[in-house]
Amino acid sequence: MKTKKPIVCVIIPAFNEAEAIGRVIKDIPEMVDEIVVVNNNSSDNTQEVAKDAGATVLYEKRRGYGYACLIGMAYFD
C-alpha cells in the first residue's frame, strides 16, 4: 500500500512587512508545498516582495490577524 505524501502549506498574515517578508519566505523549508501571504491592507510593497519571493499573495482589506488567517484558510478549503 502506498502512502500519500502529506501536503504542507503555510499561511502568513502580513501588514507592512516589505522589509522582512522576502527573507521570511526564503527561510521556509523546502518541504513546504505552498506559501500563501495574506496582504492585510498594507501601504508598502509587501505584496510585490512576497510575490517576487515565490509566494501566492491574497488580499484582505479588513485589518486584523484573524481576518487575514480566515482568508488564507478559505483559499485552501
Model-flagged regions — what are they?
Residues 1-77:
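Structured catalytic core of nucleotide-sugar glycosyltransferases
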